[in-house]
Amino acid sequence: MSLLGAAAAGWGLVEAGRPRLRELELAVPGLPPELDGLRIVHLSDFHLGVPSPGVLAVERAVSWTAGRRPDLVAITGDLLTRPSGEPRLRRLVERLPGPTFAVLGNHDLAIARDPLARPSALLELSPARLLSDEGELLELRGKAVWVAGTDPRMLFRRGTKTDPNSLSREAGLRILLCHFPRVLDRLEPGRFELVLSGHMHDGQISVPYPGGKVRLAHPSAPYASGVYRSRAGTMHVSPGLGTTFIPFRFAARPEATELVLRSA
């Protein structure tokens, strides 16, 4: 058993540094025809500042993103576990192409159970736009696109009680970035067409079985990774790129996803 455990841990270290880099076509109800084919690279959960093979996954994902040259890049929180990762984070963000938007996560503010986490003083992330209960209007392919992002404390109710519905504006496409997937349960229909989230790491350590797997982190969570739909809109939950608590993944490979939006 000790050999089996060592082999599993060894593979977990390898898996944590080998991101899946994939394209996913995503039907979005209400998407204007002009935005059919719009490409968004969704990245999440870098967790920089602690030793982890996840750093390799982040580096590889950023290089891949730069080569894809999408219309938009979205980063949905937990950029840092410790402030010491900030210089690397800034170098990585400078390599990302086109408009890039990001939000913070609970690890960025150290409102997490992770004993390694320390709060960072990240207030801006130029050339990316760091959103905190605010949004920005931009024009893509001749249509107005509204990108909004939440402060992660919105769902912890620590220091802010912003209603995510209040962040919506009129636009051809409205996108909400929130670290926590359960924001979908708070949204009213017609506020946002697309929600992008992270946080879950697809369990980070999972036990596969035929037809599925048991996620050891958040085993009963309604949103783990992938695409979810409700009356409030369409949500993509990223498996993320880094690690927390322990520096490996098992049956929960890190991922960078290029979403190709399609009119439903």
Predicted regions and their residues:
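N-terminal membrane-anchoring alpha-helices
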Residues: 1-34
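Soluble catalytic domains of enzymes that build or remodel membrane lipids, polysaccharides, and related
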Residues: 34-43, 48-264
